[in-house]
């Protein structure tokens, strides 16, 4: 069974595209899509008002189980940033994306996204697996 760690780009795509929502519905209902605090914080900032903020917050509580950021994340991120800098790709990787990647790699989860930066990180860190939400579940 494949378990995923959610990036905000994937969640937005799922929420806006009915066919993708259908493709991922069973995986989400089975609890196989997880979330981590930096991703939730990033996503919650997109709420237009308090009502939408509460809707998003409940979505995370009820559907996307929390995955803890590992204590070793800073070391993993530092290694990946150095590899990215050596290839001139370090400016493309946000702090939130790197934390999501470090968490997914640590817990053996596949990053679920709609953002090419995760493909870049996978090329820099062989232990990271990623999946574009448009490709459907593995």
Protein language model annotation of sequence segments:
Residues 9, 42, 75, 98-99, ...:
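Active-site phosphate/pyrophosphate-handling residues
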Residues 7-8, 39, 114:
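A secondary-structure boundary/capping signal
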Residues 1, 30-33, 62-65, 105-110:
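Short active-site oxyanion
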Residues 1-35, 45-58, 137-138:
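Short, well-structured N-terminal submotif of metal-dependent ribonuclease cores
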Residues 21, 40, 53, 74-78, ...:
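A general structural signal for well-ordered alpha-helical segments in protein cores
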Residues 1-3, 101, 105-138:
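Acidic, PIN/NYN-like endoribonuclease modules and their adjacent C-terminal/linker elements
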Residues 50-73:
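Active-site-proximal, substrate-binding regions of enzyme catalytic domains
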Residues 65-112:
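Active-site neighborhoods of divalent-metal-dependent phosphate/nucleic-acid chemistry enzymes
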């Amino acid at each position: 069974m494949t378990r995923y760690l959610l990036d905000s780009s994937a969640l937005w795509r799922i929420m806006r595209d009915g066919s993708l929502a259908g493709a991922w519905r069973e995986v989400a209902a089975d609890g196989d899509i997880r979330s981590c605090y930096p991703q939730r914080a990033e996503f919650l900032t997109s709420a237009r008002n308090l009502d939408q903020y509460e809707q998003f917050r409940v979505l995370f509580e009820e559907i996307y189980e929390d995955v803890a950021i590992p204590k070793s994340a800073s070391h993993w991120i530092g290694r990946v940033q150095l590899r990215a800098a050596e290839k001139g790709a370090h400016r493309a990787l946000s702090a939130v994306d790197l934390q999501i990647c470090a968490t997914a790699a640590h817990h053996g989860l596949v990053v679920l996204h709609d953002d090419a930066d995760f493909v870049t990180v996978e090329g820099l860190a062989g232990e990271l697996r990623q999946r574009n939400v448009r490709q459907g579940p593995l």
